[in-house]
Amino acid sequence: MGSGHQIITLAGILLLSFLFLTVNKNNSERASSLYKSGSVIDANGVAQSIIDEIQCKAFDENTITKSVWSSDSLTTPNSLGPETGETQNTQFDDVDDYNNYSTVITVGNYGDFNIHTSIKYVMNMSPDNISNSQTYSKRIEVAVTNFSYPDTLKYYHVISY
């Protein structure tokens, strides 16, 4: 085999090696993208389940057994959170009990999802604006983190009385 054949053979081996490395890199990137997409889908499910759980509760501690005719009768913004003795979400009986609630939910291949909720009064006709006083609308914010994505995913839902 002459030196010309050796050079062509070597070039062919290098080209084939480059092709295999490129295909392997593309497959790895695709698998990583699929994994991240799957974890975001599961994060959506986890956040929605927390929102659904919160929506099943009374709007306010003062609306559990009676109607409220004035927003001034609702829990003050500084008092949002669980009442004395309510230490677990199974004991929560109204929406604002979930203010500053944190938990970890483990989902299959995607590991732990760290959940943090925040409840705020918002302007009735402008739910993006936080209110410093009681209103008939509360915004639920669910923040979800997971090791597979660098950012915190935030989900919002407004509930009104």
Task: Give each language-model segment a name.
Residues 1:
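Active-site histidine-acidic residue metal-binding/catalytic motifs
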